[in-house]
Amino acid sequence: MASVNKVIIVGNLGADPETRYMPSGDAVTNIRVATTDRYKDKASGEMREATEWHRIAFFGRLAEIAGEYLKKGSQVYVEGRLKTRQWEKDGQKQYSTEIVAEQMQMLGSRQGMGGEGGGGGGGYSRGESSGGGGYGGGRAQGGGGMSRGEGGGGQGGGARRQQAPSNGFEDMDDDIPF
């Protein structure tokens, strides 16, 4: 029987992203995202909140985008998979489970995010397109949030914004009120 390793998180960053580069030149960005569960305490009848913190790792072009546009407090949607790392420290085995991001959508208003595409609608993925050079060479696209394996056989390389059809509203700068 097939198995599934899929995680979807919507939450807020607890700190600015930390980006570093591997010897190969590929970017790695780590973030911590808080999600809050609200529930009614059965004993007291009071509303309670429980916050969970999630470590998320981005790789390649997606890491560069996350490092550039996400900031502390930013709301973000992330799809990915769980990965557990193991190492030894002082003779003791240590474990850490994190989310390896495959797709990211920046949420919230443009005022809370820096730069173009920071508002709702900044969807990016690892973009493993055929002909795109493999892991880090795919195209990151703004707008709809491309999922893994999509994107056709276009040229790999840098990120490009997907051009939306012209509808005569290019000059409108207002945020949508809902």
From Swiss-Prot:
Biased composition (Gly residues): 111-159
Gene3D superfamilies: Nucleic acid-binding proteins
Gene Ontology cellular component list: nucleoid
Disordered: annotated span: 109-178
Protein name, as recorded: Single-stranded DNA-binding protein
UniProt keyword NAD, yes or no: no
NCBIfam families: PRK06958.1 (NF005406), ssb (TIGR00621)
Residue ranges of every copy of the SSB domain listed in the record: 4-108
